Amino acid sequence: MSRFFAGGGSDSDSESSSDSEVVARPAAPQFTFSDEEEDVKRVVRSTKEKRYEDLSNIIKNIRNYKKIKDMSSMLTSFEELTRAHTKALPVITKVENGVTPRFIIRALAELEDFINMVWEDKEGRKNLSKNNSKSLGTLRQKFRKYIKDFDSDLKKFRESPDAADDDEEEEEKKEESESEDEQHVAPAAAKAVSFKKEVKQVKVEKDDDESDDSIDWDMDSDSDESSSDEETQYTSIRERFLKKAEKDDGEDAENKKEKKKLQKDSKDRLKKKRAEDDDEGWEVVNGNRSTSAEQPKMFAKDAEIDVNVVINKLNEVMAARGKKRTDRKLQIEFLRELRTIADTHNLGDAVAAKIRFNIVSAIFDYNPKVSEPMKLEHWSKLLEEIQALIKLLLANDDIVLSETILEENEEYETAPYKIRGCILTAVERLDDEFTKLLKECDPHSNDYVDRLKDEVTVSSVIEQVVKYIERLGNDTETCRVYLRKIDHLYYKFDPNVLKKKKKELPASTLTSVDEMDRLCRFVYAKDQTDRLRTRAILSHIFHHALHDNWFQARDLVLMSHLQETIHHSDPPTQILYNRTMANLGLCAFRHGNVKDAHQCLVDLMMTGKPKELLAQGLVPQRQNERSLEQEKVEKQRQMPFHMHINLELLECVYLVSAMLLEIPYMAAHEFDARRRMISKTFYQQLRSSERQSLVGPPESMREHVVAAAKAMRHGNWNACSTFIVNKKMNVKVWDLFYEADRVREMLIKFIKEESLRTYLFTYSNVYASISVPYLAEMFELPKSKVHSLISKMIINEELMASLDDPTETVVLHRSEPSRLQALSMQLSDKVTNLVDSNERIFEMKQGNFFQRGGNQGYNRDRQNYRNQNQNQNWSGNRRQDNRENRGNRNQNRDRDHRKQHRVEFEEKAE
C-alpha cells in the first residue's frame, strides 16, 4: 500500500512539471479529504434565522405554485405558512416589537392579488381541474379569514409597495458576508476542487480587456501551482491524512487581500464598460412594438408647416392604424403633438376638427377587444376630445363633417370646409362604451355611482350632436340620434308629469312625456327601417306606463300589433319588448285592472326565467345547455343595474293578480272535472303548500301570497289582507310603488270584493237566502257595492239566485247538485270508464283471429244481429253490442235522474 501511494505522488510531480503535454489530473486527490470539510466552522444560527428561513422557503414555494396555478399545492403551502408564522410569533414579538416583517406582508399581498385574479376569471376557473377548483374555493375562504389580522399592515404596504424589505436586505448582506468568509477560510488545497467555478468566472469576464484576461489566467496558474505544491508537500501518508496541516498564516492573509482587490477592480471595470455602452446609443428592443425607426417622425426643425404638410403627416400616422405592430399609445401621442403644431401655426378650425376626430378614433382603437370596456383614463380623455370636437363643430357653421364626403373632395382651406367622418357613429360608440363600463362595475359599490355620474356628460354630448345633426337636415341620422336620446330618457321617472295631471303645475310646463312624444313622432314619420320604429314605439309605451298613462300605453300596444311580429326582431328589441310588457303590467295593476296585469305578466312568469328574459342576469344552467360563446354574448346584452325592474315586485304583482282571479274561479268550478287553470305558476305554489304536512308562519313573499289565498278560499278577507299588506310586504314590495298608500287601498278593496264572490260560490248550497246588509257588514263594503256584485254574478249566470229588493235578501236556487250528488256522479263516471277500459283490454288479450272475412264479416254479422235479432255472431261481437247497449241504458238512466232532480229542486224553490 505504501509503495502504491508513493508511486502516485511521484507521478503527479512528473506530470505537473511538464508543460507541453496535457494529461488528466492525477488520482491522488481522490483519496485526500478536502480541508474545506474539516476547516469550516460550525455555525450556530439564532431562532430568528431559523424561523425566517422556514418562512422564506414556504413563500418561495408559493410563488412557484402561482406560476403553474397549482391550487392544491398552494393550499398546502399556505397552511404551512400559517403554522410557520405561528411558530415565529414569539421571535417577532421579541425582536421586531410585534411588527410583522415586510417580506411576509409582501407575500400575503401577492397571494391576495393572485387569488382575486383567478377567482374573477370565470372562464379560466371553468378550465381548472376538479381538485384545483375545490382547493381554490377552500384557499379563498381560509385566506380571507386569515388576513383580517393583517388589514392595517396590508394597507400600509399597498401605499408603498415598492419599498425594499428590511429582512431581505439583511439576508442578502449576510449571504454576501458568508460567501466571502467561505472564500477566505478555504485553504489553498481546496482550490483544486473549486477549479470549475474559477473557469466559469473567467468565461463571464472574458469580454474585458486583455489585461483582465491575463490577470485571471495568472490567478488560475497560481492556483494550479499551489495545488501541485500542496500535493507534493506531504512526504508521508501520515501527513496527508492529518486533519489540519501546518500553513503560513501571513501568506494566506496576503492572498486573501490580493484576491479581494482583484475581484473589486474587475467589477468596477465591468460597470464602467456597461455605462459606456449605454452612452453609445444602445437601446432595448421590445418584440411586441415597433421600434422608433419604424414610427413616423415629426417635421424637421426648419421645415415649413402648412395645411398640406400637416394633412399628409396625419395620413401617414393614421396609415399605421390597425396594423399588428403599431404602438397605439404612441400613435395617440403623435396625433396630439400634431394638433399642438396645427394650433401653433393657426392652420384653421377645419384641420383642428380633422385631427381631433382622428384622435377620437385612435382612442377607440386602443382597446382591441370589443367586448371589454376601455380603461378609465382613456374614457376621461375620450369624453374631453368628443366634447371639444362637438363644441368646435357647433361654433363653426362652415364645417361639414359627413361620411358621404370622399377623401378626394375634402376641403380645409376655403369655406365651406368639408371633412370626411361621422360624428354620430363616434357618439354611438361612446354610448356603447359607457354601457360597458357600467356593466363592468359592481352595482353595489361607489365605483358604479361614480361612473353613473358620467351619464350627465354623455346625455349632454348626445344633446349637442342632436343640434348638429338637425342643422345638417339628414332625416336618417336624425332618427338614429333621436333613438339614442330616447334610450337615455324612456326609463326615467318624471314627477312633474303627475303634478301636471293634478294641475299643480301650469299646462305649458314641458315634461319628459312631451319630449318623448315629440321624438317618437318624428321617428314614426321619417324612419325607413322597422327596427328604429319598433324600438321607438316600445320606449314610448314604457314611458307612458311608467307615468300611469294606462290607456295611451294600451292603445299603442293594440294599434302597433307588436305582439304578433316581435318574434322576428333582434334579441335587444325582444328584451325591450319584455321590459315594456312588464312595466305595462305594473301600470295596469296600479290602475286596478287585475286581469290586464295578469295577461301582461303571464308570458314572462310562466317560463320561470324572468331574470334572463329581462336581461338582468344569467340563471345557472347545466353544462350542455349554454356554451361559453352563448354565455359571453348574453352577458353583453345585459342591462345596467340602474335600469333593472324589481323582480320580486313583478312576481308579487303577478301572484296577487293570479290569486284574485284564480280563487273565485276555483270556488265556482269546484266540481268541474274539465276546469282549466288560469295561472299554472300560482296553482303549483298553492298545491305544493297544501302537500306539506306542517306549514309554519309565512316568511317569504310567495308564502305570504299562498297564505292569503288559503284565507280567501274560506271568505276570510281580513286574514287575507293581513297577509298581503303588512310591514314586511310593505318594505319588500308595496313601498316601491309611487303613491304606495293608494295602491294598498285599492288592493284591500279588491280583496274584499273577491272574498265576497268566493264566499257566495263556496257556501251557496248552505244558504236558502242571505241578507245583503249582513254581507255588507261582514265584508265592510257599501250595500250598493254588494248589490252590484251580486247582480253581476246573477247576470253572468255565475250564481243561481234572485234579489228580493223589499227585504234586501238574496234567494239562492239549488239548480246545481249537492256535494254528495256531485261526488256520486263523478264516481259513476269513473266506474263506467274503468269498465270500458277493462273490456277493451280483455278483447286485446283474446283477439278476433277466427272471424270470418276479417272486418267486413265482423260488420256484416253485427248488422245481421241488429236487424234480424239473430244470435249467430262470435262472442267478441256479442260483448261489443252488449256493452254499447248497456252504455246507452246508463246514459238514459242518468238523463232521467237529472231531469227528476231538476223538477224536485224547482218544486221546492217555488
From Swiss-Prot:
Compositional bias per record (Gly residues), positions renumbered to this chain: 1-10
Keywords from the UniProt entry: Cytoplasm, Initiation factor, Protein biosynthesis
Biological processes annotated in GO: formation of cytoplasmic translation initiation complex
A molecular-function term among this protein's GO annotations: RNA binding
Record bears the keyword Acetylation: no
CC annotations in GO: eukaryotic 43S preinitiation complex; eukaryotic 48S preinitiation complex; eukaryotic translation initiation factor 3 complex
Protein name (record): Eukaryotic translation initiation factor 3 subunit C
Species in which this protein is naturally found: Aedes aegypti
